[in-house]
Amino acid sequence: PGLENFSGGAGDAEFWEDNPPQKSYVVEVSDNEKRFQSFQFTVELPVKGIYKWENIPAASPNKNLASIPVYSAPTRKILGGMSVVRAHLREAEGVPAAWAVLEARFEGNLVARGIADRDGQIVLIFPTLAPQSSPLVSPPATATQISLAEQNWLLDLTIKYEPDIFQSSPPVPAESEEEVFPDLRLALAQSTGRIWADTEQTEESETATLSLGKELVLRSRAAEILSPPDSETVYSSYLFVSPAI
């Protein structure tokens, strides 16, 4: 509604010189095959030509593109040759970290970004990184290369989480099955929060090791209990995070 005169216009140079009045519209994006997260964004229409996304964050993997970015849903099918990082994000009180943004970097370069769903589940899916050579040792003749099966990459992790930015009126109940469309620009504009290595939130987590051919599932260590010193570390089902302060 509101674009009737525009849709019947000639669309030529003279038409655009008359500066047809613009109105704000909310666009909702949903994938029936559940490959990508649902979201919404506001756009001023009409626009001349193809609409160009104007709010791609700095250092985005898509920084040279003007298309609207989409982010994988946890239910997306994984294709060959792709690396996967998963997490189920929670605050200390057990509240799902809905719409939190997780970023992974390797050697300072952003390799993937994901947005959590309303239950805090998130996945980053990206092409497998280039194989790494082992560092040179002395003498140089003893230098070796890591075999393909032993390849791994140390990723730097950042969480962007500012739940108050998504205040809706009225709020959608957590148990509701109604589809929710978080504002994409707001999601990407969230400030940096904290990732916790342990459930007691005494140690922050900033890195994780991705191994070739294996999904990396990020989880916080469970609280320590009396057990033999050589017992295996117990992990929670969740990766605990805190909002930006």
Feature-to-residue mapping (PLM):
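Short, acidic Ser/Thr/Gly-rich low-complexity loop/linker segments typical of extracellular
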Residues: 1-10, 109-131
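N-terminal accessory interaction module
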Residues: 1-56
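Beta-strand-rich interaction surfaces with strong enrichment in secreted/lumenal proteins
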Residues: 14-16, 111-114, 144-145
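A short, solvent-exposed beta-strand micro-motif common in secreted/extracellular proteins
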Residues: 23-33, 133-141, 150-163
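Exposed beta-strand and adjacent loop surfaces of beta-rich binding modules
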Residues: 24, 84, 98-101, 154-156
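Structured interaction patches on ligand/partner-binding surfaces of diverse proteins
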Residues: 34-62, 164-223
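Beta-strand-rich domain onsets/edges
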Residues: 49-84, 90-95, 114, 217-244
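Short, ordered, surface-exposed loop/turn motifs in non-cytosolic proteins
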Residues: 93-107
